Amino acid sequence: MSNHNTNSGFTHEKIETSNFLMIVLILLVVAFGGIVEIVPLFFQKSTTEPIRGLQPYTPVQLAGRDIYVREGCYNCHSQMIRPFRAETLRYGHYSVAGEFVYDHPFQWGSKRTGPDLARVGGRYSDEWHRIHLINPRDVVPESLMPTYPWLEKAMVDPEEMAPHMRALRRVGVPYTDAQIAGAADEVKGKTELDALIAYLQILGTNLK
């Protein structure tokens, strides 16, 4: 009579019953998959070069982007238009990698409680955005968006901009010394509402 409980060699059961072996194999598979999927992207120009006309954010726009992140806008709004007809008809040209090369980190988001904002730049006036951010129900009665009245009085901190821009330059954003030196003066006197509107108004304007 054969002994069915005797296992030899590299078996499925041995993998499942050994935590260490399972972890090692998972790490190997993930590492290999990452090399195969991610590394080639660094050598494709379409994913590493900016689209024509793309410029780094101005200091005011950059401050607005920081406010967008701070207030968690990415939790309810995406910035990624998929190449589906329903989305391109509603929002415009589908998103491409070259639009986001200066975004660290990118703001693609993962859900749409509110609409996608990838092409919102220039779609509404500054005044519309001002009213909408202070009280969304004044322009969209059925809106679920929270109010942000404090942005109208909170001022952008000029001292934060130069260090932020220098940090971005280290990761490849082509800010010049002159742009960094003039950043504080450019945002001086700007409210957080001004900055956030400036950021929203630039989104998607390089590719329609």
Each language-model region and where it sits:
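Post-cleavage N-terminal segment of exported redox proteins
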Residues: 1-57, 171-176, 197-208
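Electron-transfer interface patches adjacent to heme c in soluble/periplasmic c-type cytochromes
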Residues: 22-31, 89-193
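Short, solvent-exposed loop/turn and secondary-structure capping segments
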Residues: 35-41, 78-80, 85-90, 144-145, ...
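Short, well-ordered alpha-helical packing segments
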Residues: 36, 61-65, 118, 130
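Sequence context of c-type cytochrome heme-c attachment sites
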Residues: 40-54, 59-62, 78, 94-107
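Electrostatic cytochrome c docking/interface patches
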Residues: 45-69, 81-88, 113, 183-186, ...
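The canonical Cys-X-X-Cys-His
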Residues: 64, 70-79, 196, 200
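Bilobed periplasmic-binding protein/Venus flytrap-like ligand-binding cleft at the lobe interface
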Residues: 68, 132-137, 198-203
